[in-house]
Amino acid sequence: MPFEASALDSVARETRPFAAELEPVDWVEPSEMVIHSKQYRVMGQMGEGGMGTIYHAYDPVLERDVALKVMKPGLPGAARQRFRMEALYGARLSHPNLARVYDLGFMPDRGLDWFAMEHLRGKDLDRLLARARQRNMRLSFAIVAHVFGGVLDALEHAHRRGVVHRDVKPSNIFVCRDVEDGRIWSKLLDFGVALDLARHKGPIEICGDPRYIAPEQALGNRPLDGRTDLYAAGITLFELVTGRHPFHDLLEAPSRDLLAAQCERDVPRPGNLLPAAVSKEVRYGLDVVVQRACDKDPDKRFASAADMRTAMLDVLRGAPERHDMTAA
């Protein structure tokens, strides 16, 4: 029921004295810098990456737990730039399937950069896959659809903003549980080698994990775009549904052999490695999704992460589950 005009007039009269107290302050100029000093109480070490050590910390001002990533000492200037860019991307890209970055700073007494980010409780997909293999099991199709669907959502968000991740792989996908509602979430992490297509000028540095790198990323023979990430996503999807890497025979070989395989060998059909209980329709559907994502020619891959997500969900959502395909 709409308010009557007289009622609105009454509210306006009652709030006018309060509004008068909220006149713009004149002791802070628009061009001034507001300087603050943040302090975090370190609770313990959580993990370690190539460029930094991650600590569980507590923010006493906002009364919340955070993950504090501190850059390792002695790294070259290029590594420091990557470290800072990881934080900037985390603050700039806001999506439920990306970890939020709260703050970025510098420790002058130690000469180390740091940033504070969302504190996540869970495990990365690499660990979950290893645990499933130890038990001779696979992740369920339902888990793959939910977890990896979120990753593709995050990639779509980044790609629409001109950011290519360049390091999509299971160890950079974190599976966590929301402490408030108990829901499972996936978070795409580590934008340390990400590429901003709008800002980057000149030659592109070749970087990435040989186990997941796209041919054009390894060779540096053509411009990169979001479809570069879809190749790595296809390799990851193969690993999630089969429990093993498509080029598992080369994982202990020199990196050059693995890079050659990424550029020259077709990715196997995942359907051939699935249990007999999986229907022909699901096998064929997964073959199509993975092989299209992993085509050596970027122009033949999915046009977007959203398209790949739709195709994957069309296959997996109707797939029946069996206990011998579920990792506990």
Give the ranges of each region predicted by the language model:
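Activation segment signature within eukaryotic-like protein kinase domains
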Residues: 147-148
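Activation-segment/catalytic-loop signature of the eukaryotic protein kinase fold
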Residues: 104
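C-terminal lobe helix-coil module of Hanks-type protein kinase domains
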Residues: 160, 174, 211-327
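AlphaC helix of the eukaryotic protein kinase fold
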Residues: 72-92
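Conserved N-lobe ATP-binding subsite of Hanks-type protein kinase domains
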Residues: 53
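Conserved short submotifs of the Hanks-type protein kinase catalytic core
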Residues: 110-124
